[in-house]
Amino acid sequence: IYKTSKISESCINPHKNWHDVEEQYFNSPKQIIYIDNFLSDEAVKELRAFCLVSKVWNREYENKYLGAFSDRGFISPIHLQIAINLKQKLPKLFGQHKLGKFWAFKYDSTLGKGINIHADFAIHNLNFWITPDEYNNEKNAGGLKVYDAPAPEDWTFHKYNNINADEISKFLNDNNAHCTNIPYKFNRAVLFNSAYFHETDKINFTEGYESRRINITYLFGNRLVKKKN
């Protein structure tokens, strides 16, 4: 495990007006925004070093990407400080919601594709990218596609997280869901309603260990599930 250096100030960008970010989210008609220059330069450098050096990528998925999880080694003082700083700087968004799970995925686009369409069990989903832009071969792609129709409250986690993609597509079509496609950018965060269905956009990154696309996800709060009678 890479031992991260202590960050001298906030892990999230200390020069950004975070009150404006909160207002942008609350005024967004779809609860989908992106935040450029999300982490401080110091924090993103250390977090990237942690991801490159630490042997925490211990789960392989069908689409050939790897996962690392907070309860299986993907954790450091920086990981936790990011959550603390989010609560401090964006109290209206995160203050009342407990940090749930957080994880990272690493993709080799020569082997497979990204994550299939799904939703997550939380209130807010914060997803950010830490692989430098120089490795992304398609500058207007490689990011995240978010559909502005939340998973039904009476669907179980297994149903909206592992369901057949055809059934989700039918649900989105029936509900006239619009897709917001946020292109990949280094140190860009995407914040959205975690009940929204989302999937990885087409990825095309340069071959090589350091060039693999890495995204990190933090979940805040618990989504209410409607009990069946």
What are these regions (language model features)?
Residues I1-A189, A195-N229:
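Fe(II)/2-oxoglutarate oxygenase catalytic core
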